[in-house]
Regions:
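Conserved small-residue-rich beta-alpha loop and adjacent elements
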Residues: 75-131
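N-terminal Rossmann-like NAD(P)+-binding subdomain of aldehyde/semialdehyde dehydrogenases
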Residues: 1-86
Length: 131
């Protein structure tokens, strides 16, 4: 089971943003099917919302996490069966790039890790849409 929860750090205060509050630190296999399905559903939700069309960076992100693209990336990697996840990853993203945290989050998920994200301090609409 993919136990998703997003905790974000705002100005040194950890705040639960979405998902489950008590995330079990379960190590998943890299590029597991449940994560790939989740990303594909997220992609569709972002693309299908007409209001998101005014944010090209968000639409680009949504196309990047589509099933076909993730499977293409997976196919390019060698020996995924021998790879082991680390457990929990803490991401600190720059405050001047709205969706940098989302790309880090995806890489964390795809490598089978639980993630804690520090969201940008600036009030970007893309961050609110994503979270």
């Amino acid at each position: 089971m993919l136990n998703l929860g997003v905790a974000a750090m705002y100005r040194k205060t950890l705040k639960h943003v979405c998902g489950v509050k008590n995330v079990n630190n379960t190590i998943n296999k890299p590029f597991n099917n449940l994560t790939i399905k989740f990303l594909n559903v997220l992609s569709r939700l972002i693309i299908e919302n007409k209001e998101n069309k005014s944010y090209p960076d968000l639409i680009t992100f949504a196309f990047w996490i589509r099933n076909s693209k993730i499977l293409f990336i997976k196919k390019k990697l060698d020996n995924l069966e021998s790879k082991v996840s680390k457990g929990i990853i803490f991401h600190i993203s720059p405050s001047n790039v709205p969706l940098n945290f989302a790309y880090s989050f995806v890489f964390g998920l795809l490598t089978g890790n639980s993630n804690i994200l520090k969201l940008p301090n600036k009030n970007f609409p893309q961050v609110k849409i994503f979270c």
